Amino acid sequence: MAVPFRRTSKTRKRLRRTHFKLQVPGMVECPNCGEMKLAHRVCKSCGTYKGREVVNK
């Protein structure tokens, strides 16, 4: 079985891992109630989406 010829340096290892990171969710302000919510999703506090009430609270 093949083995690495040289040890992978810290810099090369870290450069390879720069893409393995968590993404921050896109938060926007709800136009109806003003609370922060995830973009393109129903507001948890008032239950509206695109100006319409989707969930009865």
Swiss-Prot record:
Keywords: Ribonucleoprotein, Ribosomal protein
InterPro entries: Ribosomal_bL32, Ribosomal_bL32_bact, Ribosomal_zn-bd
Matching Pfam families: Ribosomal_L32p (PF01783)
Gene Ontology CC, one term: large ribosomal subunit
Keyword presence, Zinc: no
Keyword Ribonucleoprotein among UniProt keywords: yes
GO BP field: translation
GO molecular function, one term: structural constituent of ribosome
Domain of life: Bacteria
Stated family: Belongs to the bacterial ribosomal protein bL32 family.
Listed name of the protein: Large ribosomal subunit protein bL32
